[in-house]
């Protein structure tokens, strides 16, 4: 289930190890084997061909014997009977598929924070290829000079670098008092913050965005301390695993919906595995 990164890696590896077995992939979107980590650099103009983020096409996988169905969404998993329910998004046809082993690699989606007027034009996320194409187009317009980024995690800071590479005025607004606070100690984040400011990024820490302002299209970001002019607002407030189609009473998850796996990628359900943004990771230090 899912053919972006982890799913296609698993499919390709399994087919190499067991060439006589059927490997079937259902992907909700229309592309597979996509490296989303390249999005900020594509948006920033570090390279121009979006195909550089695609490792292999569906046709290449099919030639290798992997059966791929794009624009097909898995809507339910019956773990007891080892069946998945799939909807063809082109025809709305619903079908059932049985499995012997199941890999869940449904990824994650960008979190949309509960901010007033979040649906104004030029307010974007950066998670999918469509997001990247949209933001790249907006960034290429001369009139879009001021970029506000809400969130100072990996995506937020990489988006800041991309915008600066485009010659934009960049403001990063972070709820916490440090960038990447959940990832690095203060010694490291102090260096990151210094680097950001030296490169002209307006870094606003310990501020809460309360409202977006604009007449159809965003023009300002309002925080608990000030208003900032913005032609584009990038939402970089984290991601949520795409596991809503699963019954949490049947498969173990943590609070945010990520599927719990062991160091072999096994879930709490026999013959079911998970990997990628929809799953937890196993710590090499704690072995949990």
Residue ranges and their predicted role:
Residues 1-71, 160-184:
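Beta1-alpha1 glycine-rich phosphate/pyrophosphate-binding loop at the start
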